[in-house]
Amino acid sequence: QSMKICKFYVKGKCTQENCKFVHKDNICRNYFLQAKCKHGDKCKFDHSYKIRKHPKNTTDFKPNHKRCSMNIEIADGNQEKYNKDIYKNDVIIVKNMMQQEENYMYYNQLLKEIEACGIPEDELMKLWHGDTHLIADDKLDWKEKVPTFEKIIKRIEEYFGMVVKSTRFNHYKDTNAWKPFHHDAAAFKPEIAKYQNMTVAISFGVTRDTAFEFNDNKVTLSIPQHDGDVYTFSENVNIEWKHGILQVSPENYEEKGRLSIIAWGFVEQK
């Protein structure tokens, strides 16, 4: 209703012969234009109308030199090492760090080796809590029999200058498999945070979205992880954001799998 009132008429100076807005008398000019009147309820003019304020499209004209809550870096997987400083709020995306020669090469090789490691699948692969996907049981002796896994971990160590403290082999058998939003243990266990300040994940197989959820306002963002892609997150990202793997909607279901190799460890960060 307030937008139908001619603000220029209220001000006493509308010059349009056929104005498309209403020229209404007895409106309180101060209340209409400023949403306040010093006379309050005693004002003899009408307080039923006030102009709608348009939000400003720019609110801060001072440069802000703070680093963002999340800073995303895109890195070259063809390089021998990551060539930038790593910051506590970094997420680093690396394309084809393992330089695989054809699609699904590492996916197929990893599955072949872990199936041939000598441990029955029902003993080796355990459901992650929540029963959302499978992980290889680290308590069993399989890693030395999966040389491609050790090759990948070594590449992670060398590329990021990382001291790897623990690892994981995840298997998402189809697009129904997913991982809920969560923090890695270093976010809330000081004894782990002493030697783990960075998570590195490399994906093989079908493209899936990794996503982050900000603690304060639940804002989310997602980053597609293609075959061979790496994403990392540093100390503050793990504390301030949860992360997970989104489930694909049922109508887009595919019986295609994804493997992710995770390394947790320590990297010098600014």
Segments predicted by a language model, with ranges:
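Cys/His Zn-binding finger modules involved in RNA regulation
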Residues: 1-69
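Non-heme Fe(II) oxygenase metal-center motifs and adjacent flexible, charged/small-residue loops
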Residues: 54-270
